[in-house]
Amino acid sequence: MAVPARKTSKTKKRMRRGHIKLNVPGLTPCPNCGELRKSHMVCPSCGYYDGKQVVNTNN
């Protein structure tokens, strides 16, 4: 079986994994209330989507 000839150093391992990272979700301000919300989703604070109230929020 193939076995690595030398131990992989921390630097080489970290350089190889440098592109692996967490992505920030795309947040946009709600045009109705101004709160940040995910794109193409109903606003959790006011319940509006595309200028229409979709979810009834008792605020």
UniProtKB/Swiss-Prot annotation:
Record's keyword terms, sorted: Ribonucleoprotein, Ribosomal protein
GO molecular function, one term: structural constituent of ribosome
A Pfam short name: Ribosomal_L32p
Top-level taxon in the UniProt lineage: Bacteria
GO biological process, one term: translation
Alphabetized InterPro entries for the sequence: Ribosomal_bL32, Ribosomal_bL32_bact, Ribosomal_zn-bd
One GO cellular component term noted in the UniProt record for this chain: large ribosomal subunit
Keyword Ribonucleoprotein found: yes
NCBIfam families attached to this UniProt entry: rpmF_bact
Membership in a protein family: Belongs to the bacterial ribosomal protein bL32 family.
Protein name, per record: Large ribosomal subunit protein bL32
Species of provenance: Limosilactobacillus reuteri (strain DSM 20016) (Lactobacillus reuteri)
